[in-house]
């Protein structure tokens, strides 16, 4: 136990355009080498293109796509005796958002398109329609947790 006070998690500043903390976190995860303005331009142009295609507000589209990718359960390794079990555990809300954002960005980076904004637009559109690599990743994680349901009593 630390003798000094426990330092809480730093509050993230909301993004300038939509004043959303979720979107600011997404921009921070997308950012490479501290180039935040480039990451902001990519995200904002992707959301603008998406709003033209879907004809809804940008932030509503983003949140809906994120909700379709969020995992409910995941597996964690737990060593019992001499063997390691994959124990299914429920995902905390903060980690849910972080995993969903990371999976969307990774899937967008693996796509083959001209620019990152187009790749991100297509991946968010796929996530909105419950298809695409990010949604496949969530289904894979859920399937893994379902297969290891027998070890749920090892939860800690």
UniProtKB/Swiss-Prot annotation:
Q: Name one GO cellular component term.
A: small ribosomal subunit
Q: Which CDD domains match?
A: uS7_Bacteria
Q: What keywords is this UniProt entry annotated with?
A: Ribonucleoprotein, Ribosomal protein, RNA-binding, rRNA-binding, tRNA-binding
A GO molecular-function term, please? tRNA binding
**Segments forming a coiled coil:** none
Gene Ontology process terms (BP): translation
Q: Which Gene3D superfamilies match?
A: Ribosomal protein S7 domain
Say if the entry is tagged with keyword Isomerase: no
Q: One Pfam family for this entry, by name?
A: Ribosomal_S7
Q: What this chain does, per the record? A: One of the primary rRNA binding proteins, it binds directly to 16S rRNA where it nucleates assembly of the head domain of the 30S subunit. Is located at the subunit interface close to the decoding center, probably blocks exit of the E-site tRNA.
Q: How does it assemble?
A: Part of the 30S ribosomal subunit. Contacts proteins S9 and S11.
Output the HAMAP family linked to this UniProt entry.
Ribosomal_uS7_B (MF_00480_B)
Q: Which family does it belong to?
A: Belongs to the universal ribosomal protein uS7 family.
This one is known as Small ribosomal subunit protein uS7
Organism, per UniProt?
Buchnera aphidicola subsp. Cinara cedri (strain Cc)
The gene is rpsG
């Amino acid at each position: 136990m630390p003798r000094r006070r426990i330092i809480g998690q730093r509050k993230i500043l909301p993004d300038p355009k939509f004043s959303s903390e979720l979107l600011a976190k997404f921009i921070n995860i997308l950012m490479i080498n501290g180039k935040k303005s480039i990451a902001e331009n990519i995200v904002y142009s992707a959301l603008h293109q998406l709003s033209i295609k879907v004809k809804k507000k940008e932030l509503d589209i983003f949140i809906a796509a994120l909700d379709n990718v969020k995992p409910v359960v995941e597996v964690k390794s737990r060593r019992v005796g001499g063997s390691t079990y994959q124990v299914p555990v429920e995902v905390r809300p903060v980690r849910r958002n972080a995993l969903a954002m990371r999976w969307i960005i990774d899937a967008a980076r693996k796509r083959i398109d001209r620019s990152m904004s187009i790749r991100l637009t297509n991946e968010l559109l796929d996530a909105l329609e419950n298809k695409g690599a990010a949604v496949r990743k969530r289904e894979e994680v859920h399937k893994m947790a379902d297969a290891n349901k027998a070890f749920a009593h090892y939860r800690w």
